[in-house]
Amino acid sequence: NLIDLAEKRKDVVVFISPRRADVVNIANSTTQAANVKNFFDGLASSSYAVFDSGYKFMFDKFNDVFRFVPLNGDIAGLCANTDQVADPFFSPGGFNRGQVRGAVKLAFNPTKAQRDILYPARINPVVAFPGQGIVLFGDKTALAKPSAFDRINVRRLFILLEKAIATAAKFQLFEFNDEFT
């Protein structure tokens, strides 16, 4: 699966949304919250994965219709945008860098009480705030145990550092590098 692949590679992060049937066309937000939590409870713990809470309703200009689309692509895009406007060690969430674009509404808009259940369960809520837009309101990786690596920005920073160190270290190969030499 993708989480195992990311764990083996150690240079990527996987962004995962819940199943469409868990949130789209379900009228009761309590049921949606339970469905989302149950789906992600079955997935492995990893700092190389990021879970979000659902789907956005947007216009598909290629087919001239509105449709629900998973938010995992948006969350990956927020990380890419964070790289452009700040640095990988900044959080992609919040009102400054976490604005989801192109969304008309959310299939599941978690309440404060639901967010308080989802976030400790490793799920980053995406929330529509009236007059303020739709925002990624979390910064968690899918790591189950408390650690610095249970934050998206910390995992992304270490991926960047590991690549930079590997690049710099290859130039020290075959150089004098011990006490004798």
Regions picked out by a protein language model, each given a short descriptive name:
Residues N1-F180:
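Structured, hydrophobic secondary-structure cores that serve as assembly/anchoring elements
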